[in-house]
Amino acid sequence: MSKAPAIGIDLGTTYSCVGVFQHGKVEIIANEQGNRTTPSYVAFTDTERLIGDAAKNQVAMNPSNTVFDAKRLIGRKFNDPSVTSDRKHWPFNVIDDGSRPKIQVEFKGETKSFYPEEISSMVLLKMEEIADAYLGKKVTDVVITVPAYFNDSQRQATKDAGVIAGLNVLRIINEPTAAAIAYGLDKKVGTEKNVLIFDLGGGTFDVSILAIEDGIFEIKSTAGDTHLGGEDFDNRLVNHFVDEFKRKHKKDISSNKRALRRLRTACERAKRTLSASTQASVEIDSLFDGIDFYTSITRARFEELCIDLFRGTLGPVADAIRGAGKNSSGQNFSKSDIHEVVLVGGSTRIPKVQSLLQEFFNGKELNKSINPDEAVAYGAAVQAAILAGDKHEAVQDLLLLDVAPLSLGIETAGGVFTPLIKRNTTVPTKYSQVFTTYSDNQPGVLIQVFEGERSMTAHNNLLGKFELSGIPLAPRGVPQIEVTFDVDANGILNVSALDKSTGKENKITITNDKGRLSKEDIERMVQEAEKYKADDELQRDKVQAKNSLESYCYNMKQTVEDEKVKGKISEEDKKTIIKKCNETVEWVDKNQTAEKDQYEHKQKELEKVCNPIITKLYQAGGGMPGGMPGGMPGGMPGSGSKASSGGPTIEEVD
């Protein structure tokens, strides 16, 4: 069998999407519910693990064990201010594990905790399964997208999530870059075009400016807000309705997780409605203390509740334009240099967001030709095809230049940040600079690596540090230490320091100091992920066995109670079957967590009672009434009425 093609996965904060490039075009793949985007949700219940729509659909009943927003935690420290503020909004528990966040849930009656990478790996696994089902073969090679703003740690953690899911991550690429590829394929342009990508999704906001010429994409600048998106608009609606409920019913629902979650689901629906209509109604039965909550909201009121957030999207647009450097005629970049404005992300469907952006660009038509939910996965699928060596002419002449999202450098005397790789430098890239000692007879230097845009390291983000020791004693300023920064195509950073006189070298790949996963951690998580997958399959078999047993019972009862069999079956036989079926149904109700073989065993017992009677019925009157399916569910032969001798025991399904 030929190898499965590589796929592109848009791993979103709230929703994810998967695409594949084959037969010369990209296909966005629908999940088993027929949806082309899948919620980035994982739920843990008493009996099973659910991922995607199934997880999001049961969130109201199980809020504290339904995990979403893992992308807001991935690659961050527990005490990161954004994690601290997000935790207030989450119904699930986040704990501190050696300064790394872990999500704590109740699963199958036990308390379990997972790293964000593990949760993301479950979502990635789901996306891969969606692709497997569509392609009919197992996919291993993927390209995964991340926000342009993600720092080194977040990129590495996302890659780790792919590895835990058993995937071969060909590359991590920026979401706007992916959207640009989608756009570039749709619009083959000869002359250079400057494109501004405005990506407002469920959880993050990114603005990027790209120069596209002859199939070559160059990212000129990126800006954004890692914490702005559709969920923030939902929160405004939730707060608005919590206040309304207080006013109308003098009750505060804000401490009731389930009521809040049901309200949030209704708010998300209302928000989507308001993109197409000017009014939306909200109807929730028995929201709190038996009170039905029926209300409505207008588009104008929704816009008023969120106007500061909507206007706030224009700041990063201006920042990106300022950061784009010079235009083709050597002048500073200005908004008149933008040829196209492209909308990406579901939240760009909001009319007010579109009109504010259009006003900012003096009435320019916005580009909505790409489905905003699918553009990123579309581009990732194309990039996956390129990296996997697809020879199709549609991707042949496409070249991609990505950029470093933040300046990278080291601390020099007095806590000054000295950048070696400037923000928006095209990657992969390598840069070396010679430094020297600060004091006489200094035996070693401490190389501290930072990312950020501030002039003092205290305000930037420490990525890692290492020492270069054994420098020959000499007056200050004499030793020559060459520091090299090397960023690879995935945006992963290697830093080395070389003492030119001795040839001594030391280096660091920016990993564990930022709460990265060690190789052992990843291997353990890969094994656990496989175990959970096997558990899921076991659970599925269990459910099938239980359903098979139940439907056998109901079919049997239906058959003997059918008017058509009157006179063809004795009352005694009829009672025997009904009694045995009722006993079995009762047993199933009491044994919801039995094993698969217990259910199968019960079904065999039941068949031993029913089969001889049904055979008599056949002989008495030909065809079988009651529409019993051929071979009956479970298709198990058997006869006799006492508890069967050997034979498997039964298991239950829920």
Curated annotation (Swiss-Prot):
Residues 639-648 have a biased composition (Low complexity). NCBIfam families: PRK00290.1. Belongs to the heat shock protein 70 family. SUPFAM superfamilies: Actin-like ATPase domain, Heat shock protein 70kD (HSP70), C-terminal subdomain, Heat shock protein 70kD (HSP70), peptide-binding domain. It comes from Hydra vulgaris (Hydra). GO terms for molecular function: ATP binding; ATP-dependent protein folding chaperone. Residues 621-654 are annotated as: Disordered. The lineage of its organism: Eukaryota, Metazoa, Cnidaria, Hydrozoa, Hydroidolina. The keyword ATP-binding applies. This is Heat shock 70 kDa protein. Coiled coil: none annotated. Keywords: ATP-binding, Nucleotide-binding, Stress response. Residues 621-638 have a biased composition (Gly residues).
